[in-house]
Amino acid sequence: MILYPSIVDLMEKVDSKYTLCSLVAKRARQLIAGDTKLVDIDSDKPVTIATEEVNNGLITYQRPKKYGIK
């Protein structure tokens, strides 16, 4: 269970809990693969680092356009 940043703060950065989970998981995998962290925190845990990056607005996402039936 995360205490900081709160889920309320994180939800202001994304449109759903699913998006938040996917965004943090993808970034954590990138960190495990060797990407440089974008925040200066004491933790070495990739999920914690990714969560903090999202909270600071350093990691964003873009929804693809929906394709409907014509």
Swiss-Prot record:
Reported EC number(s) for this entry are 2.7.7.6
Kindly indicate whether the keyword Cell membrane belongs to this entry.
no
**GO CC terms, sorted:** DNA-directed RNA polymerase complex
**BP GO annotations:** DNA-templated transcription
GO MF terms listed in the record are:
DNA binding; DNA-directed RNA polymerase activity
Please indicate if the UniProt record lists Transcription as a keyword: yes
Catalyzed reactions per annotation: RNA(n) + a ribonucleoside 5'-triphosphate = RNA(n+1) + diphosphate
Cite the entry's keywords alphabetically: DNA-directed RNA polymerase, Nucleotidyltransferase, Transcription, Transferase
Q: What does this protein do?
A: Promotes RNA polymerase assembly. Latches the N- and C-terminal regions of the beta' subunit thereby facilitating its interaction with the beta and alpha subunits.
Q: Identify the PANTHER family for this entry.
A: DNA-DIRECTED RNA POLYMERASE SUBUNIT OMEGA
Assembly and interaction partners: The RNAP catalytic core consists of 2 alpha, 1 beta, 1 beta' and 1 omega subunit. When a sigma factor is associated with the core the holoenzyme is formed, which can initiate transcription.
Q: Please report which protein family the annotation says this sequence is part of.
A: Belongs to the RNA polymerase subunit omega family.
Which protein, by its recorded name, is this?
Answer: DNA-directed RNA polymerase subunit omega
Organism, per UniProt?
Answer: Thermoanaerobacter pseudethanolicus (strain ATCC 33223 / 39E)
**Taxonomic classification:** Bacteria, Bacillati, Bacillota, Clostridia, Thermoanaerobacterales
Gene symbol of the encoding locus: rpoZ
